[in-house]
C-alpha cells in the first residue's frame, strides 16, 4: 500500500507540498488511483463528483482521507456528492464546530488533525502595505474594510475581494509585502481559520 497526496484547489497546494515532502509521500499531479492505495485529499469539495465516481468505478479498491476545510454554512455541504464522499471515507477537520455539525446533520464521523506546518518564506525587504485583506466579498467584510479605511486614512491598504491571488506564489508575494493581515470570517459563527493565520505568520506578517 502507498500513501499519496492530492490537492483539489491551488489554495491548498502549499499544504499538500509540505505534507508530501515531510512524510516522503507522492504528490499526485495526474490522478490515476491504484488498488490498495490511500489518498490524502486537500480541497476534496472541489472534486467531489470525480473522486466519488472513480471510487465507485474501481469498486472501492482504494480509499481517501478527506481533509475538510469548509465551514458549517458552506454551499458545498448542499452537494450530495461531497456528503456521500465523506460518508464513504475517513474525514478529518481542524475545528470542533464543523466536526459536530457533520456528525449531527449528516452522520459523518470526523476526526481532528493538527495544524500543518508551512514553509518559511524569505521576507521582502520592504513591506509596502500596512494592512492586507484577501478573501471573498460579502456585505460585512466590505462595510468593515470601508470603516477601517475611513478611520485610518494614513495607512496603505491592499484589499482583494475578487480572489485575484488564487495561486500560492501570488498570495505569498502579497502577504510578504504586508505588515498586518486581517482575518475576517465570511460566515456568521465561523470557526477560527487557523490555516490562514499560519500562512500569514509564515510570510512574516
Report each predicted region and the residues it spans.
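Nucleotide-sugar donor-binding catalytic core of glycosyltransferases
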Residues: 2-36, 40-205
Amino acid at each position: 500500500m502507498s500513501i499519496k497526496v492530492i490537492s483539489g484547489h491551488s489554495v491548498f497546494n502549499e499544504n499538500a507540498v509540505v505534507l508530501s515532502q515531510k512524510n516522503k509521500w507522492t504528490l499526485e499531479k495526474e490522478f490515476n488511483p491504484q488498488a490498495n492505495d490511500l489518498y490524502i485529499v486537500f480541497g476534496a469539495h472541489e472534486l467531489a463528483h470525480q473522486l466519488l465516481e472513480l471510487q465507485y468505478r474501481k469498486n472501492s479498491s482504494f480509499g481517501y482521507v478527506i481533509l475538510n476545510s469548509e465551514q458549517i454554512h458552506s454551499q458545498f455541504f448542499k452537494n450530495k456528492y461531497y456528503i456521500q464522499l465523506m460518508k464513504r471515507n475517513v474525514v478529518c477537520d481542524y475545528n470542533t464546530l464543523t466536526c459536530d455539525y457533520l456528525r449531527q446533520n449528516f452522520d459523518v464521523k470526523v476526526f481532528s488533525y493538527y495544524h500543518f506546518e508551512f514553509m518559511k518564506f524569505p521576507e521582502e525587504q520592504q513591506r509596502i502595505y500596512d494592512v492586507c485583506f484577501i478573501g471573498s466579498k460579502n456585505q460585512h467584510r466590505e462595510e468593515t474594510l470601508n470603516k477601517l479605511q475611513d478611520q485610518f486614512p494614513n495607512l496603505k491598504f491592499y484589499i482583494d475581494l475578487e480572489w485575484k491571488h488564487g495561486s500560492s506564489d501570488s498570495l505569498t508575494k502579497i502577504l510578504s509585502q504586508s505588515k498586518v493581515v486581517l482575518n475576517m470570517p465570511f460566515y456568521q459563527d465561523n470557526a477560527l481559520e487557523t490555516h490562514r493565520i499560519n500562512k500569514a505568520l509564515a510570510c512574516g506578517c
